Amino acid sequence: MTSSLPNIGFISLGCPKNLVDSERILTELRSDGYNIIPSYENADLVIVNTCGFIDSAVQESLEAIGEALEENGKVIVTGCLGAKEDRIREVHPKVLEVTGPHSYEAVMQQVHKYVPKPAYNPYVNLVPKQGVKLTPKHYAYLKISEGCDHRCTFCIIPSMRGDLDSRSITQVLDEAKRLVEAGVKEILVVSQDTSAYALDRSKEEQNKTVFWNGMPIKNNLISLCEQLGKLGVWVRLHYVYPYPHVDQLIPLMAEGKILPYLDIPLQHASPKILKAMKRPGSIERTLERIKKWREICPDLTLRSTFIVGFPGESEEDFQLLLDFLKEALLDRVGCFKFSPVEGAIATEMPDQVPEEVKEARFHRFMQLQQEISAARLQQKVGKVFTVLVDEVDEEGIIARSIADAPEIDGVVYIDNPNRVAVKAGQFIEVKITRADAYDLYASLIN
């Protein structure tokens, strides 16, 4: 049935936001009747959706483009690195076309140009109403906005993806409903700046009452989360910038409407470094808020990311960061050594930190946080949790608790000696038997 259809090869690189863009393009391709294949060999055209956030990601994208050109020869480039067409063509002048991020229509026009759209076939053009998804069937990313209004000095995202542009709340909720109807058990809300949702709209628009499913709602983040919480699935928030109104989300978590999980990138704890980064600078206020959040929602899991070795970071600045970790006792933490990014203000700042110092600070940071994370997980031993199954194999079951986002957090390894019938996407009850620095181990509760 599909052998005569034109074949499109597809490579998706980068973060979950880019993954959502890839899903959108793949959905359009399938709707137009193209066959998606995982290899270069038999492809009539290859699309590479690139990442350009840091220099290592740029290099990975350029290598992927080069490999596609070498193996196939007909390549269209899109995504974040596509915003720097000159950079791409300097290395790979033979690419057919280049577009920037979220340029779905342009990508499809280019595909039609080089590989004409096949005749409509109702059996082939049929696409699930939730669209093509690259994640397992039981979870999906829901992108609520594009771009960012912040100008952090280490970041070039606004130059590639533009200023904040929020989707309408009814559009977001319609997509979420389709995902749930398709069997999704966990929705992961993503954007460049999730807590800024709808702040690009006027006050009048934000306060305007709209109707969804017959219910009056406001066009803001709190209303969005309240409605998502009524869909009967796990709802997890990522990339939450620490605006004051984030405090209003915590009661929703305490009430079980959305998962008690906040992915809130703090980046540093030194006021001097935060100012240089153009990030919120009151770390004392942040600690006060964390304490209050945990009082309201004791089960709250806090994830954050930090940068060590930022230009001008002294040993004193770094010690402030370590002191913050000891006091905040965050559950999940990612750490990155500052990486110069072409076009970022911080790349040109004076007092660049030597690589060996960055490396040493990174290891000191990770060693401390590993001890904190291990102690936090140890507190869960002996307790009973509901977990969502990701995989089942001969060795047992791999699942995640409400504290574990896919790909970036730990997992729960569950013994299943009696081969109890369990499948991916199922919620099960387990008792935690032990813990290490990142993962939990558990037994099934019949």
From Swiss-Prot:
Question: Which reactions appear under catalytic activity for this entry?
Answer: L-aspartate(89)-[ribosomal protein uS12]-hydrogen + (sulfur carrier)-SH + AH2 + 2 S-adenosyl-L-methionine = 3-methylsulfanyl-L-aspartate(89)-[ribosomal protein uS12]-hydrogen + (sulfur carrier)-H + 5'-deoxyadenosine + L-methionine + A + S-adenosyl-L-homocysteine + 2 H(+)
Instruction: Give the E.C. number(s).
Output: 2.8.4.4
- Domain TRAM as annotated: residue spans: 378-446
Looking up SUPFAM superfamilies in the UniProt record yields: Radical SAM enzymes (SSF102114)
> What Pfam families does the entry give?
Radical_SAM, TRAM_2, UPF0004
Domain (Radical SAM core) spans 134-375
Q: Which domain of life is it from?
A: Bacteria
Q: What class of enzyme is it?
A: transferase
Domain named MTTase N-terminal is located at 6-116
Q: How is the cofactor bound?
A: Binds 2 [4Fe-4S] clusters. One cluster is coordinated with 3 cysteines and an exchangeable S-adenosyl-L-methionine.
Q: Where along this sequence does the record place binding of [4Fe-4S] cluster 2?
A: 148, 152, 155
Cofactor(s) demanded: [4Fe-4S] cluster
Keywords on record? 4Fe-4S, Cytoplasm, Iron, Iron-sulfur, Metal-binding, S-adenosyl-L-methionine, Transferase
According to its UniProt record, where is this protein mainly located? cytoplasm
The answer on whether this UniProt entry bears the keyword Iron-sulfur reads: yes
**InterPro entries, alphabetically?**
Elp3/MiaA/NifB-like_rSAM, Methylthiotransferase, Methylthiotransferase_CS, Methylthiotransferase_N, Methylthiotransferase_N_sf, NA-bd_OB-fold, Ribosomal_uS12_MeSTrfase_RimO, rSAM
Sorted alphabetically, the Gene Ontology cellular component annotations on this record are:
cytosol
Quick one: a GO biological-process term for this protein? tRNA modification
Q: Which residues bind [4Fe-4S] cluster 1?
A: 15, 51, 80
One of the record's GO molecular function terms: aspartic acid methylthiotransferase activity
The record, for Gene3D superfamilies, names: Methylthiotransferase, N-terminal domain (3.40.50.12160), Nucleic acid-binding proteins (2.40.50.140), tm_1862 like domain (3.80.30.20)
Record's subcellular location: Cytoplasm
What does the UniProt function comment say about this protein? Catalyzes the methylthiolation of an aspartic acid residue of ribosomal protein uS12.
What family does this belong to?
Answer: Belongs to the methylthiotransferase family. RimO subfamily.
Its protein name is: Ribosomal protein uS12 methylthiotransferase RimO
Which species is this UniProt entry from? Answer: Pasteurella multocida (strain Pm70)
Its organism's taxonomic lineage begins at: Bacteria, Pseudomonadati, Pseudomonadota, Gammaproteobacteria, Pasteurellales
Q: List the gene name.
A: rimO
